Structure formats: C-alpha cells, structure tokens
Design a protein with these regions (language model features):
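Alpha-helix termination/capping residues and helix-transition junctions
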Residues: 4, 19, 80, 110, ...
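Single conserved hydrophobic/aromatic residue that forms the stacking wall/gate
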Residues: 1-7, 11
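Active-site beta->alpha loop and helix N-cap motifs at the rims of alpha/beta catalytic domains
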Residues: 9-126
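Catalytic alpha/beta core domains of metabolic enzymes, predominantly
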Residues: 124-205
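A general structural signal for stabilizing positions within well-ordered secondary structure
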Residues: 1, 16, 77-78, 137, ...
Length: 205
C-alpha cells in the first residue's frame, strides 16, 4: 500500500522535474508503477500531482487499462481533477483485434474532452498500430498525440509524414532520442527524461 507520508517526497520530485525544465509531466505510467496499483491508489497519486503542479505545465496521467470501463473511469477522474490530457496504453496481454482497439479509444473519446495520447508499445502490448492505422484514428478525432515506443526513428518520420501537425508525436524510448528528434518528434517521453530531466531538456533545446 502507498502511505500518505510519501506525499512530500512525491512533491519534492515533481518540483525538481519542473525546476529542471520539463515542458510537461506524465505520472502513474509504466515508470510510475501503475501496473501494481489499485484504482484508488492511482487516483490518489494523480490527483495529488495534478493539484501540486497546478497548471504550471500540462499533466498527462497514465490511465490505460485492459478494461475499457476502467480506462474510462480513470480518464474521467483525471479530467475532473484538471489534467490536460491522458496517456493511454493500448489493451495489452490478450492482443485484441485492431477493430476492438479502435473501438476502445472511440468509447474513451466519447467519455472525455481532454487530449488523448495513445501509448503505442509493441513490446508490452504484443502488437502495434501502424502509421496508417494511427492516421485513421487521428482523422476520426480519437487521439491527439502518440507516445511511440518502438525505438525506431523511422516510425517517427512515418507518423509525421502521414499526420503532420494534427498529431503530437512523442519519442517513447530511452535509446536514440536524438535520432527521434531529427526524424521530427515533438518531444521525448520515457523513463530516462524522468531520471535526467536537465539532460533531456538540453538535448531537446
């Protein structure tokens, strides 16, 4: 269980990340250990961080679950707390049909008004959405951004080619971020920037 006494450490860390030049904050994602949290623990942490940051930069909590209903519940709570958007990993483990994945995001889009960043992680999900499939989701208005965790800068180039400025593309791997930026990535969202935020900001600039 997460102790309430840990809140001060969470706040100190978030302030350090902000002071290091972060353009935005993502919390309770993979690096934030959300897979081991209960729904209530996840809600508690996301609310604490959203309240602490207080719109100084956008906050994008990780709200993706295999269950569409749970994903919607967490995402609606993030919106109620004041998050600017949500980071949503695709349904994982059982590798659902692509039509079911799109419908998962369609139901989520119907439930919230804030930005939706799709977390495209082939390693954890066992499948990926292709650039053309992503384009179709963008054209339908289902997503606003993508965390592309392939570790392949060419994928970044393809996404920007097909979607242009309609999609915020975030490089989502710890390795080769410069190649991702050179391919057109709009930002870097991964574990490494959370550990070395000043380095990440310097690389971005």
């Amino acid at each position: 269980p997460i102790k309430s006494s840990a809140a001060s450490d969470v706040y100190k860390r978030q302030q350090w990340v902000l002071d290091s030049g972060a353009h935005s904050i993502s919390c309770v994602g993979s690096t934030g250990d959300n897979i081991s949290m209960s729904m209530e623990e996840q809600k508690m942490i996301m609310k604490s961080i959203i309240d602490f940051v207080d719109h100084r930069v956008p906050v994008y909590p990780g709200t993706g679950r295999y269950s569409t209903a749970q994903t919607i519940e967490l995402s609606k709570y993030a919106q109620e707390c004041g998050a600017e958007g949500v980071l949503v990993i695709m349904p994982y483990y059982l590798q659902p049909h692509k039509r079911a994945v799109v419908n998962h995001f369609r139901k989520l889009r119907e439930a919230i008004d804030i930005d939706i960043i799709l977390y495209n992680n082939p390693r954890f999900c066992g499948y990926e959405m292709t650039p053309l499939e992503i384009k179709a989701m963008v054209d339908e208005g289902l997503i606003n951004g993508i965390k592309a965790a392939h570790g392949d800068a060419n994928r970044i180039h393809e996404l920007k080619y097909y979607c242009g400025d309609k999609l915020t593309v975030l490089y989502g791997h710890d390795y080769a971020p410069m190649e991702g930026f050179l391919a057109g990535a709009d930002g870097w969202l991964s574990g490494m920037p959370a550990i070395f935020p000043k380095f990440a900001r310097t690389l971005f600039d």
